[in-house]
A protein has these predicted regions:
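Short alpha-helical segments and helix-capping/turn motifs at coil-helix boundaries
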Residues: 1, 11, 29-31, 46, ...
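Transmembrane alpha-helical segments
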Residues: 110-117, 156-160
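Transmembrane-helix signature of polytopic, membrane-embedded enzymes
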Residues: 114-136
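Membrane-interface coil-to-helix junctions
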Residues: 17-110, 138-154
């Protein structure tokens, strides 16, 4: 595989991820996919980024269910997603932007890791491109865009 073909595949997957996540991707600094779970998940990822540099051993001592201790353990800690979003959170302090960019990155990486896996199995870049597209952009990921931790699937193809 030439690096230019890999770059073209990644560019196509980024474009598809931006289209797939619209309208949040069109106004990423102040729009989330919904007012329910995405708001909570953006908060959790921002909390993780905040706490990782402030007091990493107290990561689970979130203020979300104050005064209960270790309240982040009441739900998903989202640490893998938070690590993807952390640089944006640290640089901008904008949880919505960080969450939206992490979602776009997750979809792009999901498609690309499946591309790499399928290419290794089939030896065909065209089939690998279609496999990556089908893996990341399907009815399941479309309905679960509200839950970044559910569509954070880029790790599975790497397991094989």
């Amino acid at each position: 595989m030439t690096s230019s073909r890999a770059a073209m595949a990644v560019a196509a997957y980024v474009l598809a991820a931006i289209v797939w996540t619209a309208p949040a991707s069109l106004s990423p600094t102040d729009t989330l996919p919904d007012v329910g779970d995405p708001v909570h998940l953006a908060y959790v990822m921002a909390w993780d980024a905040h706490q990782l540099v402030r007091a990493p051993l107290s990561l689970f001592d979130s203020n979300s269910f104050y005064p209960y201790p270790s309240s982040l353990a009441f739900g998903d800690h989202l640490l893998p997603e938070a690590l993807m979003a952390a640089p944006v959170n640290w640089l901008t302090g904008n949880a919505a932007l960080a969450s939206n960019l992490a979602l776009i990155a997750s979809l792009t990486l999901s498609a690309f890791t499946m591309f790499l896996f399928a290419r290794r199995i089939t030896g065909l870049e065209s089939a690998a491109f279609v496999a990556g597209f089908a893996y990341a952009f399907n009815s399941f990921t479309r309905t679960e865009l509200l839950r970044i931790h559910v569509v954070n699937l880029q790790w599975w193809p790497l397991a094989f």
